């Protein structure tokens, strides 16, 4: 079973892509003369990242799967890791700037209100000294305290080179973390512990994420990380990460040597425009309102044909498990594979 379904190359997905995804992947890869699998996996992760947990896909049993991925890609220096991500990260940076312009406007309004309250606080204090009635003063102090507690943080559409405290702070502030790193290294164990916390309920439960007891509803974590082979080996062999379930939830791709053809060309304007429009539409659909409230979750459900294929796959798993002495490990692996298939199906949608 493992041999039959083992994937040594992501190219198997190329035949499954919608025409525009295929065209984007090939155009960007040809432009930089790099492995198209790098581009494909980057696009998958970054479409999921732009959605920010807005969509869930539901299987026939009613189980929800968020569209977040955890992709780790191994390749040596000079293979085009940064180039594979560049065009998409530029779009992410552009949108982050747009959202933060709105953030600055909201912050200016909040600051203006705070200054008014501070002036009213002094008036109320003077009145309380004369009258002995502190009710108005207490109300104003309460509003000031609430304003301070609800202070928003600048939007971080994606992060890289992250530490555990930074990861927690970003999640607490906005409810999601997109980790995109074109040249990552081994992470601190505490980062993995943070990720494991967010995944503990598969993203559908209210999870305690800080020592102060703050909670976030439906946390969304998504990552595409390129790394050197030495760090990749450490990641997949580290028992701590495996015990936490991080490795099992990951899409791991060790790239074979890529033979460059030396025929680079500019990325087509159509590719740039279509990819930008796709990501901007997802960003706008998942954008919080002026009060910081996220839009209601949208649910994707399998059609009859897709459900039939998934059931056939699960039946094949059950059959193979009964024939193989390593059945439990195979079953667990296939459950994770099935979940990844659902997520990728939702992303393709």
Regions picked out by a protein language model, each given a short descriptive name:
Residues 1-349:
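Phosphate-handling catalytic cores of nucleic-acid transaction enzymes
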């Amino acid at each position: 079973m493992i041999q039959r379904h083992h994937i040594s190359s992501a190219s198997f997905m190329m035949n499954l892509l919608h025409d525009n995804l295929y065209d984007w992947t090939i155009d960007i890869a040809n432009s930089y003369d790099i492995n198209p699998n790098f581009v494909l996996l980057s696009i998958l992760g970054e479409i999921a990242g732009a959605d920010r947990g807005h969509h869930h896909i539901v299987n026939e049993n009613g189980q929800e799967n968020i569209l977040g991925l955890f992709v780790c890609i191994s390749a040596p220096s000079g293979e085009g890791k940064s180039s594979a991500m560049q065009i998409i990260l530029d779009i992410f940076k552009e949108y982050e700037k747009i959202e933060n312009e709105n953030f600055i406007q909201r912050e200016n309004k909040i600051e203006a209100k705070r200054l008014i309250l501070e002036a009213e606080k002094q008036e109320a204090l003077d009145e309380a000294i004369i009258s002995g009635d502190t009710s108005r003063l207490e109300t104003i102090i309460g509003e000031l305290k609430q304003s301070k507690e609800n202070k928003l943080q600048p939007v971080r559409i994606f992060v890289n080179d992250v530490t555990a405290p930074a990861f927690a702070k970003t999640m607490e502030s906005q409810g999601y973390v997109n980790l995109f790193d074109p040249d990552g290294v081994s992470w601190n164990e505490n980062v993995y512990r943070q990720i494991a916390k967010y995944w503990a309920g598969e993203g559908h439960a209210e999870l305690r994420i800080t020592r102060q007891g703050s909670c976030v509803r439906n946390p969304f974590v998504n990552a595409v990380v390129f790394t050197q082979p030495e760090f990749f080996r450490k990641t997949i062999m580290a028992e701590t990460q495996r015990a936490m379930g991080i490795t099992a939830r990951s899409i791991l791709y060790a790239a074979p040597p890529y033979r460059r053809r030396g025929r680079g060309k500019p990325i087509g304007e159509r590719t740039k425009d279509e990819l930008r429009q796709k990501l901007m539409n997802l960003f706008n659909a998942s954008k919080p309102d002026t009060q910081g409230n996220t839009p209601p979750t949208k649910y994707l459900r399998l059609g009859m044909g897709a459900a039939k294929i998934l059931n056939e796959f699960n039946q094949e798993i059950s059959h193979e498990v009964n024939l193989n002495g390593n059945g439990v490990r195979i079953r667990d692996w296939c459950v994770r594979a099935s979940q990844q298939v659902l997520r990728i199906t939702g992303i393709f949608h």
